[in-house]
């Protein structure tokens, strides 16, 4: 049996998903492909890594197999019996560009196991199983957006998701005359995982200081009671949530000019208040600002490298792409990687 699960790109709502905030992602047309069959022991094969790993029972190896093993462990924790299987994976999802290849692998595994063994796990439960694999087994304290999008994605739509209640709404993504590109900065600073966890701690500090249970209870007035770093972090989360709401409205009205401006202001906030951008992604966004037909751009993902999402009029980005490549190479000695992004449905059999 074969399945595929998509990556995702988040239009706006960065570093809000673990703060009970709003996000606006869509599933993209790049996938993790996975096949599953019965076996004497657990065998996991990755075409991309060109490696096969065998094990008698599920164990943590601190490598790519943990995403698969973690999902199996999540099923077993819930009382499902997963007998040994051979799982083979391949992917055309770029790693480290902010398209969430790990969540796609987790969701592909969860869906394949549910279908293969006839568990018929509901969609939302699949999301939770996949996320639990990353948080508890792999050990990355991610929010729920990535796994949610890989399961619930719908072609030609973005998902307006409230990460606190998990209520969601499909918002039509009518891009006629416009396009979305992803520019991969081709850098990943070592800080990324340690700083990501530090931002989470800082946000928890904010709640402790304000004696609130959730960021949803935090108001603009509360910012007055904070100072320094904590104030900056809280201000980003509050304003980014507002930007998501405005972006949903703009998408519904087909107002891409407004959406573009919101992307630029999101980047400024991630740079100045949340302090997770880096010289390379700042350079890309600054370069694009004011160029003809470019409506907006911002860093995507955890930060400290990774990708930049670009919203433009159709064809406009292609005209300045070469200049951008040259300028970036001259400045950093690194080649950019480009991905034109289209929307996709969520996980499915193939």
UniProtKB/Swiss-Prot annotation:
Biological-process GO terms, alphabetical: galactose metabolic process
GO CC aspect terms: cytosol
PROSITE patterns named among the record's database cross-references: GALACTOKINASE, GHMP_KINASES_ATP
Record: residues binding ATP: 46, 96-102
Catalytic activity, EC: 2.7.1.6
Residues annotated to bind Mg(2+): 102, 134
Enzymatic reactions: alpha-D-galactose + ATP = alpha-D-galactose 1-phosphate + ADP + H(+)
Pathway: Carbohydrate metabolism; galactose metabolism
Annotated catalytic residues: 146 (proton acceptor)
Record keywords, A-Z: ATP-binding, Carbohydrate metabolism, Cytoplasm, Galactose metabolism, Kinase, Magnesium, Metal-binding, Nucleotide-binding, Transferase
InterPro entries: Galactokinase, Galactokinase_bac, Galactokinase_CS, GalKase_N, GHMP_kinase_C_dom, GHMP_kinase_C_sf, GHMP_kinase_N_dom, GHMP_knse_ATP-bd_CS
Site (Transition state stabilizer): 8
Top enzyme class: transferase
Binding locations of substrate: 14-17, 196
Record-level Gene Ontology MF annotations: ATP binding; galactokinase activity; magnesium ion binding
Compartments in which it is found: Cytoplasm
Xref: Pfam families: GalKase_gal_bdg, GHMP_kinases_C, GHMP_kinases_N
Listed HAMAP family: Galactokinase
Family statement drawn from the similarity comment of this UniProt entry: Belongs to the GHMP kinase family. GalK subfamily.
Record's function text: Catalyzes the transfer of the gamma-phosphate of ATP to D-galactose to form alpha-D-galactose-1-phosphate (Gal-1-P).
Protein's name according to its UniProt entry: Galactokinase
Annotated gene: galK
């Amino acid at each position: 049996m074969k399945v595929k699960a998509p990556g995702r790109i988040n239009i706006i709502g960065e570093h809000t998903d673990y703060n009970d905030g709003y996000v606006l992602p869509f599933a993209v047309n790049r996938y993790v492909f996975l096949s599953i069959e019965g076996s004497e022991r657990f065998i996991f094969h990755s075409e991309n890594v060109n490696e096969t790993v065998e094990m008698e029972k599920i164990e943590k190896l601190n490598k790519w197999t943990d995403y698969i093993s973690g999902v199996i462990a999540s099923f077993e924790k819930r009382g499902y019996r997963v007998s040994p299987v051979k799982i083979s994976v391949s992917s055309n999802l770029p790693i480290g560009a902010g398209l969430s290849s790990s969540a796609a692998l987790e969701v592909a595994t969860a869906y394949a196991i549910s279908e293969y063994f006839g568990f018929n796990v509901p969609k939302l439960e699949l999301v939770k199983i996949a996320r639990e694999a990353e948080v508890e087994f792999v050990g990355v304290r991610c929010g729920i957006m990535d796994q949610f999008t890989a399961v619930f994605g719908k072609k030609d739509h973005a998902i307006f998701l409230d990460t606190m209640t998990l209520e969601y709404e499909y918002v039509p993504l009518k891009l006629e005359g416009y396009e979305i590109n992803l520019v991969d900065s081709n850098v990943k600073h070592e800080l990324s995982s340690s700083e990501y966890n530090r931002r989470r701690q800082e946000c928890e500090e904010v709640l402790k200081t304000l004696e609130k249970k959730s960021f949803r209870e935090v108001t603009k007035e509360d910012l007055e009671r904070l100072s320094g770093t904590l104030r900056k972090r809280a201000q980003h989360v509050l304003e980014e949530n507002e930007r998501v709401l405005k972006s949903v409205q703009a998408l519904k009205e087909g107002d891409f000019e407004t959406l573009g401006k919101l992307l630029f202001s999101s980047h400024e906030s991630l740079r100045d208040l949340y302090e997770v951008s880096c010289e390379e992604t700042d350079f890309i966004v600054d370069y694009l600002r004011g160029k003809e037909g470019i409506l907006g751009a911002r860093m995507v993902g955890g930060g400290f490298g990774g990708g930049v999402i670009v919203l433009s009029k159709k064809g406009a980005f292609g005209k300045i792409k070469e200049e951008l490549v040259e300028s970036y190479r001259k400045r950093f000695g690194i080649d950019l990687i480009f991905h034109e992004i289209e929307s996709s449905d969520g996980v499915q059999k193939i």
